[in-house]
């Protein structure tokens, strides 16, 4: 008896990009309503320049790992509802 390895489904580049964007969006939605005000304002300012998206994403992931049950402290994490450094 020989077992076959499971076949991996081929993914197209467009699908990979979509999955990354969805993961980033979900991470932002989870962390932006839970992080302290200072951290959120710093992230918004970093995202404004555009070059720091990966760095902010890594910091969000680290924050999620450290605070897996972080309480919701604001209703929305968008730039319009939280003006500050990034405006």
Swiss-Prot record:
Main subcellular localisation: virion
Subcellular location: Virion; Host nucleus
Keyword Cell cycle: yes
Keywords: Cell cycle, Host nucleus, Virion
Cross-referenced Pfam families: Lentiviral_Tat (PF02998)
Cysteines paired by S-S bonds: none
Superkingdom of this protein's organism: Viruses
Motif (Nuclear export signal): 40-47
Annotated Gene Ontology cellular component terms: host cell nucleus; virion component
UniProt motif (Nuclear localization signal) ranges: 48-55
Database matches in InterPro entries: Lentiviral_Vpr-like
Role: Seems to function as a Vpr-like protein, since it mediates host cell cycle arrest in G2 phase. Cell cycle arrest creates a favorable environment for maximizing viral expression and production.
Name of the protein described by the UniProt record: Probable Vpr-like protein
Native species: Caprine arthritis encephalitis virus (strain Cork)
């Amino acid at each position: 008896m020989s077992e076959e390895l499971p076949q991996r489904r081929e993914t197209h580049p467009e699908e990979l990009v979509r999955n990354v964007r969805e993961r980033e969006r979900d991470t932002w939605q989870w962390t932006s309503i839970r992080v302290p005000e200072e951290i959120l304002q710093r992230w918004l300012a970093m995202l404004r320049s555009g070059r720091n998206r990966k760095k902010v994403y890594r910091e969000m992931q680290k924050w999620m790992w450290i605070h897996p049950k972080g309480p919701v402290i604001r209703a929305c994490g968008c730039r319009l509802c939280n003006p500050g450094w990034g405006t």
